[in-house]
Amino acid sequence: MTAWPTINMAATGQNITRLMKQYGMTVRDVQSAFGFSNPQAVYKWKRGQSMPTIDNLVILASMFGVKIDDIIVVEATDVASLIA
């Protein structure tokens, strides 16, 4: 069976939460850094309900001094299970 990589959004959100805590950043700090008018996007990232765009992942990685691969969690998904 072929396995395709997929992003585990919940685990990625946990990484974002961990990095924010590690660097002493609040949701409001991240919201302000991105210039968002409200914090909902950041809360959704943390809960794994949505993913930052590629551009925003690059910014997050730069803010935290890590690689994008240190933020996103990629897992293999069995292709057969996707089309069954």
Where do the language-model regions lie?
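Residues within the helices of the helix-turn-helix
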Residues: 17, 28, 58
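DNA major-groove recognition helix of helix-turn-helix
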Residues: 45-46, 56, 75
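Short amphipathic recognition helices of helix-turn-helix/homeodomain-type DNA-binding modules
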Residues: 70-84
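DNA major-groove recognition helix of helix-turn-helix/homeodomain DNA-binding modules
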Residues: 55-70
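Short alpha-helical DNA-recognition segment
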Residues: 24-44
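A short, Lys/Arg-rich alpha-helix, primarily the initiator
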Residues: 1-25, 33
